[in-house]
Design a protein with these regions (language model features):
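Noncatalytic, solvent-exposed loop/strand surfaces
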Residues: 1-174
Length: 174
């Protein structure tokens, strides 16, 4: 699961959704302060994930989707982007097969155990793949398919890289 839903096209296949609320509008169940950023929230196995930036650090939040209770967080150094406006992470994380994938706007890339937050592996998109930070920062959400996690590194040597989803080893670039 990642940005744009199960088919990554921004379309819900749910049926019977209530579209007209009138005065019977739903009330929020919970709210969480996560800092600045543009990451969407995703849900998998009853857990909600998003990223925020505060005090020169990005933090990935894992929250109980029903209660908002914080299950785990992981913070790492990452300044707000200096371009045009304040903001933190732009990419939405992705979850597949119990692993959460996250790309920061500065190029740090992580694979976490989705339930616990344990770091399984990490990469630096600039150092490891000769990547180039885009003007707006890395903002493409990872795509997980067929045992690979695919990201755009911005490299002149092949912008797209596919890494083994379990190990982070390079599978192909193009």
């Amino acid at each position: 699961l990642g940005f744009g839903g199960t088919r990554r096209d921004g379309v819900s296949t749910e049926t019977g959704l209530r579209l007209a609320w009138g005065d019977d509008e739903p009330k929020p169940l919970w709210k969480a302060k996560v800092g600045a950023g543009y990451s969407s929230v995703i849900e998998a196995a009853g857990l909600a994930y998003t990223v925020g930036n505060a005090n020169g650090k990005n933090t990935i939040f894992c929250l109980d989707a029903n209660s908002g209770e914080k299950k785990w967080t992981h913070s790492f150094p990452c300044e707000k982007a200096p371009k045009y406006f304040d903001g933190g992470s732009r990419a939405t994380p992705a979850v597949a097969d119990g692993i959460l994938y996250l790309a920061s706007h500065e190029g740090a890339f992580f694979a976490f155990e989705a339930k616990t937050g344990k770091v399984l592996w990490s990469k630096d998109l600039i150092e490891d793949f000769n990547g180039r930070r885009p003007t707006w920062g890395f903002s493409g959400s990872p795509l997980v398919a067929d045992g690979k996690v695919i990201v755009d590194t911005g490299s002149k040597d092949g912008a797209l890289v596919a890494m083994d989803a379990k190990t982070g080893d390079l599978v192909w670039r193009g």
